Amino acid sequence: MGVFAISLLSQTVCLYFTFFSLGIALGVLFSFKIFTKKLSRQHEIIRDLEHSKAILQMSLDTRRSQEQLMEEFSHKLTSVSQAFARDMKTESQEFFSEKTQAITSVLAPVHNTLSAFKQNLENFETKQAEDRGALKEQLSQLLTAEQKLERETQALTNILKHPGSRGRWGEIQLERILEISGMLKYCDYSTQTVDSSESSSRADIVIRLPQNRSLVIDAKTPFSEEYLTDNHADPTDLVKKIKDHIKTLKTKSYWDKFEQSPEFVILFLPGESLFNDAIRCAPELMDYAGQSNVILSSPVTLMALLKTVTHVWKQENLQNQIREIGQLGKDLYQRMHKLFDHFHKVGKHLGQAVHSYNDMSSSLSARVLPILRTFDKLELSSSHNKIEALSQVSTLPHSPKVPYPENDLAECLSPEASYLKPPSSNQ
C-alpha cells in the first residue's frame, strides 16, 4: 500500500511538471508569434520603402535633380534597416535570455523537490527492506516459539491424559498456592495424609488449624481427556465427573476421620477455566456440592481462604506469645518475691552485724584502748603510729520497696488473669 501511494505521488509530480513545461512553451510560442508579427510589419515597411524607392528610381530618369535626394534616402533607409535589425537581434537575445532565466528559476525548485523526493524514496525503500528483514526475523522467532509452545502443550496434554498425572498436577498447583499464601509445609499443612484406621482414605492436603483442628482439601482434578484435548468440548462431561467425584468425597467422610475437623471437605479445581466452565454449564453445582458437605474452590477462592487461615495462625501465635509473656511475668514475680525475702534476711543479718560491731567497738574503746594508750605513753613500742579509736556505724540497711502494691501485682500475674487463659474450645 505504501509503494502504490509513492508511485501515484511520483506520477502526479511528473504530470504537474509536464503541464508546467507546456505552459512555459506556449508562453514562449506566443511571445515568438508577437515578435514574428512585428518583424512581418517591418518587412512590409521595408517593402513599401523599396516600392517607393522604385518609384523614385523611375522618377529619377525624369528628375535628375532628385538623384542626390534618392541617394540620401537610400543611405538613410539602409542605416534604418541595419539599426532596426540590430535592435531586433538585441531584443530577441534579451527576450530569450530572460525567458531562459525565468524558466530555470521556475524549474529549479521543481528539480530540487524531485531530487529530494528521489532521495526520500531511496531511503524509504532501504528502510522498507530493513523492516521486511526485521519482520521476517520476528516472524521466524514467533514461528519457533509457537512450535515450541505446541510441543510443550502436546507434552502436557500427553502427561495429563493419565488420571494419576492429572491428580499430581492438581497437587502441585495446590502446593504452589499453599506456598504463596504462607502456609509452609513444615508447620501449617501436611500432604498425602493417611488415616490410621482406613489406609484407603487418603487426603491430599490437611490444613492444621488452631486448637488442633483440621481442614481437608482434595485435589484429584476430575476432568476428562476430551475436555483437555478439545477446545470446543462440551462441559457437560466435566460437570458429570465433578458430581461423581463429589459423591466419592461424600462417601469418604473425611470430617469423621480427622479429629475436630469441620463437616465439609474442599474440592480444589486447579484452574479458573475449569471452575468457570462448570458453574456456567451447571449453576446449581455449588448447591449440589454443599448438600454433600463439599465446597468447590478455584485457585482464587482457595488463595483467599488460605490467606484467612494464615491470619488466624498469626493471631493464634500472637495469643500464645501473650500467654507465654504472662507466664514468664508470673514466674518472674514469684522469683522476685523469693529474692526480696532473701534481701530482707540479708538486711536483718546486716543490722545484727552492725549492732554487734558497735557493741564490740564500744567494748574496745572503753576497756582495751585505754591500756594500749598507756603503752604509748611508756614508749614501749618502736612504732610511731598511734592506735585510733574505733568509729561507730550509724547507718543501718534498708529493706527494698516494691514499686507496686503487692496485692495488685499478684492479681495481675495470677493464673485467673483473662489474657493468660487459652480461648475456650467452643469459640
UniProtKB/Swiss-Prot annotation:
InterPro entries: DNA_recombination_RmuC
Coiled-coil intervals, chain numbering: 112-162
A GO biological-process term: DNA recombination
UniProtKB keywords: Coiled coil, DNA recombination
Pfam family membership, one: RmuC
Family according to the record: Belongs to the RmuC family.
Record PANTHER family: DNA RECOMBINATION PROTEIN RMUC
Protein function: Involved in DNA recombination.
Protein name (Swiss-Prot/TrEMBL): DNA recombination protein RmuC homolog
Native source species: Chlamydia trachomatis serovar D (strain ATCC VR-885 / DSM 19411 / UW-3/Cx)
Lineage, highest ranks first: Bacteria, Pseudomonadati, Chlamydiota, Chlamydiia, Chlamydiales
